[in-house]
Amino acid sequence: MAVATPPVETRPVRPAGRSRLRPGTVISYIVLSLLAILFLVPYYLIFRNALLTQPEILSFKWVWLPIPPHFENLQALFSDEAAPMATGLRNSAAVAIIQTVGQIFIASLAGYGLARIPYRWSNVVFYAMLLTLMIPGAVTFVPLFVLVSSIGWVNTLQGLIVPGLFNTFAAFLFRQFYLDFPMDLEDAGRVDGLNYWGLYRYILLPNSLGIMMALGLITFIGSWNSFLWPLIIGQSDRWWTVQVVLSTFLTAQTINLPALFMGAAIAVLPLVIIFIAAQRYIVEGVTASGIKG
């Protein structure tokens, strides 16, 4: 006698490559999209106002797009002798590039020494460096200015650059990265006769591209946006950076809003391009250094 088997309930096969969106996922996408739009609004206003006239900016009538765009604002910006925009861009580029390259080199050396070269007071030195992170940077401006002034570096390019070459947090990032670096590669280098400098140059440094790109991006943005220190050191318009030049528009008796927004657009455009091109290195570098939320 045959035994009857109950029918097996079958579910329709879901097409490959299609996933069912959960309500929580949809809500997350909506919230993130709204936040993205919120953060993009200031950039939209900057670039929109840069191509409008003064009456159009001050008008109560809202203008979504600058039609027609007024590119003469760009000419007015660079022809203003009281606000040397070309000089500010040149000085900002020089300061940001030199500080970025120099800070990466110095911080990588310091991090390598703290992670790989043993000596008696290494931990004491490391924790003393970490304590300096608790001191606000603005507190050090007065003694730092006195030091820079005593050696004659006021109104000089080196006065703008050298104090920003040393960064405790950057050295900390490199130290954490080198602590997690496999020792097998260094042992192989020692077998080949490499000393500490050789290990750093030929093994560790070439494998530090991720952390170098992340730190370089952060350093470049910070140097480019620096305002207070260039304002203190650059007492002559010959040494003004782009942020100091933009501040002169706000201290004038009549504010040229189109020129101000055009200058802000020019100042922010390199940062937007660099950040979009290299944003993935921030995550890779911070993750490689062992700092996770």
Language model region names:
Residues 25-293:
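A structural signal for multi-pass alpha-helical bundles of membrane permease subunits
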Residues 1-21:
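Short, Lys/Arg-rich, polar N-terminal cytosolic tail immediately upstream
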